[in-house]
């Protein structure tokens, strides 16, 4: 701890405190302060000094706070307030040294390397806090520490040049509006092409049943869910009547509003449902006959009946639980 305010008072105060003997008390006539020996009090003088933070000048300063004086040392307190030989408190004007870290970051975001009319990209790259007034009008450049690659990557070779070539920038400015206009024309042409495609829709030919069967057999074997819902047909088949279109929409829409998986057509599902009403379990011969009649493979018919039996079991379980919950009130 250094005492910069009063050097004469500092030397007298420190030397007088260092010369105090720990075994006997000391008395200062000028101030009327009596310092008892260290043996009487445990919190008294340690090592012959009044404060633990004050030592010899050659020793390193100890980082400790000055404790408040005892009630019998009131004269010492007034003596410290009068001359102020060693004070830890700083004047109110110097609260805290201003940190230079955050202003540097702020200046970095607001620096403009070139003039505003020569660097049109600076406005898009800069932060929201960027203002036109912060951009210098002169051709002088700031310290290289504020050099930003994002602003001057394309024209970095003009950084060391005192007079950059203005023709390069004017050519770039004249070329940019042309490119923007071409982009706008291309963007306006895309909706027209989409509208033309919507006006003349081409109906994709229906996939042959055999190819669809080979594709759906793998799906049916991997999914245990019931798959009796029909798939979308061609517009020629589905466009026979408005009532049939509404029923097809009901078939294709699940309770949650999503589209169902439709590996089977409506005709195939109806035939399989009729057979399931007569017999839940099929023999191999009957399964082969049904597969030929509905144009499905033997494996697809087998998987459909398995899924339909699981669905029936689930529905009966839910109905039983609903009946029990209605008969017994759990309130």
From Swiss-Prot:
GO terms for cellular component: nucleus. Transmembrane segments: none annotated. The keyword Transcription applies. This is Homeobox protein Hox-A10b. Residues 217-233 have a biased composition (Low complexity). Residues 191-200, 234-245 have a biased composition (Basic and acidic residues). Sequence-specific transcription factor which is part of a developmental regulatory system that provides cells with specific positional identities on the anterior-posterior axis. Residues 158-251 are annotated as: Disordered.
